[in-house]
């Protein structure tokens, strides 16, 4: 199952908070979809299963963004025990690239000695016997390694940029930080740029 974010280019109808809350037919269609999602089993993350009200939040947000709510749901998580819904950086990247008032997509320039990072990981075995990978480099290898993310907003002539060092990426909950750190840093850069 692909977890890439599907977007639509719907220029004919804008769905926003007002239209969702004041258009009874639209609201009911979204509520029906949220009930379908809540009962769709493994097609949605565990934090949405059996919870149509939680699914409604995703369905409404996906409608505002012009995206598939099932794909959006796959890119969410609950922050600790707070009940706060978080969006994965890949989703934020898709939203920014499809909706931001920029002249084009966000660009990336990599700098530093990435050869000390990319492809260097160590395979480990969990207590349950499952294999996983972790970074095989040290914090010293991260020194001076980073990315410059930039894009020019419509109506402006100079790009807005964000410089993000690999060492600034403190939360690395995915094994993708070991296998594809450049991609992970790019997603984080877009999230912070936005």
Regions found by a protein language model. Name each.
Residues 2-194:
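Glycine-rich anion-binding surface patch
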């Amino acid at each position: 199952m692909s977890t890439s974010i599907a977007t639509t280019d719907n220029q004919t109808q804008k769905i926003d908070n007002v239209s969702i809350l004041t258009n009874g037919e639209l609201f009911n269609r979204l509520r029906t979809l949220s009930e379908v999602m809540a009962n769709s089993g493994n097609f949605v993350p565990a934090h949405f299963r059996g919870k149509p009200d939680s699914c409604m939040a995703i369905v409404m947000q996906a409608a505002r963004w012009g995206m598939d709510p099932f794909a959006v749901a796959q890119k969410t998580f609950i922050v600790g025990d707070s009940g706060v819904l978080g969006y994965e950086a890949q989703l934020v990247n898709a939203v920014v690239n499809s909706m931001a008032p920029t002249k084009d997509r966000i660009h990336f320039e990599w700098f530093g000695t990435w050869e000390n990072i990319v492809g260097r990981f160590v395979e480990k075995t969990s207590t349950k016997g499952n294999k996983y990978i972790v970074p095989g480099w040290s914090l010293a290898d991260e020194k001076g390694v980073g990315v410059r993310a930039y894009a020019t907003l419509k109506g402006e002539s100079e790009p807005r940029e964000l410089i993000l060092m690999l060492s600034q990426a403190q939360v690395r909950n995915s094994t993708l930080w070991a296998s594809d750190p450049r991609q992970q840093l790019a997603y984080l850069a877009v999230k912070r740029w936005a």
